[in-house]
Amino acid sequence: TEGIDLWGECYSIKNTTALGWPPFIPDSVTSFPEELFSLVNLTTLSINYTNISGAIPPQIGNLSNLIRLNLSSNYLSGEIPPEIGGLINLISLDLSSNHFSGEIPVELFGLINLKGEIEYITGPGGGASIFHQGLNLSNNTLTGSVSEEIGDLINLKSLDLSFNQLESDLPLELYSLDSLRSLNLSNNLFTGEISEEIGNLLKLEGITTYAHMSTTQYDALNLSNNLFSGFIPFEICDLPLDWEDSYMDENQGFNISNNQFCAPFPPCLVSFVGTQDTYNCTQMYNQNNFNMPLNYSLSQNHPNPFNPITTLRYELPEDSFVDVTVYDMLGNVINNLAHGNQNSGYKSVQWNATNNQGQPVSAGVYLYSIEAGDFRQTRKMILIK
């Protein structure tokens, strides 16, 4: 069949489906050969630890059958080409340890099949496991904020954006990625508070691989060395971490040190707070006064899923007439949990999975809503039995 020459080796255009590390690439090679992008049947492309530099050519978009793309640990620079966002079959994308700059192209968040996977290998020297990361853009010089479109990566098991110059608050959509097992946002310039919706990430337990006598740990949650501030929500204690293990931060990979978080901390974090810059905490205490919310809000119920009781929390910045109502998915009223005037403050009400007649309801998805003044908000919760 027709072939091309790459680095002194002949590759069939039709039959070459994998080009993996380590292909023999001379140190003198500093750019991708144009012929590489004619291997349109490639499903795996892994080129690492070379002297290849400069931008990734837009012709990378020709390789539409790629499932794994790993170009980590090279000298690549410039902006990440948006054409990578057209490689819709990708389940693993690793561009870490290069010199990429600019913002993360929003097109990457259209790669809805990204997830990451563990590959198990057997051989005469024993077994081993390799983790192909879902999305790894760490160790570059990326700037800007993380787009809300990141919430489209619903299958993602690992996300590593560490060691960049990313900034601004985290989008709420990030907390909807409930397939995540590893989240590393360390060593950036992220700001703002951590949302109580972090409690949705119920698979965030870290990933461990092994080879011979060694193991590699991919952090469960690493937020260290940023500019995060405010109070850490109690929902963080819902994460599937062994909080009773004094070495949990090492064994599972948990780190929130070197931020600007303020006390009081959730009880599960007592041993894992690390060093915090509390200079601005006094001002925050005065502003919040611990009793007066600044805005109306309705929190995610806790626990969720639940059986048989869950707590719904909400905040009232002023005295209000309040309705808190549970509905089924057809919009039928199930239970009126609150109906009347309430003073401002931090409020909560429990639902015991019964209707207005006191009868137990069936398992499933329910809606709960609050109406207070001109404020309206609705959330979902799951009853299991």
Task: Go through the PLM ranges and name each one.
Residues 17-22, 45-47, 69-71, 93-95, ...:
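Conserved hydrophobic beta-strand positions in leucine-rich repeat
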Residues 32-36, 53-58, 80-82, 104-106, ...:
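The feature encodes a structural signal of leucine-rich repeats
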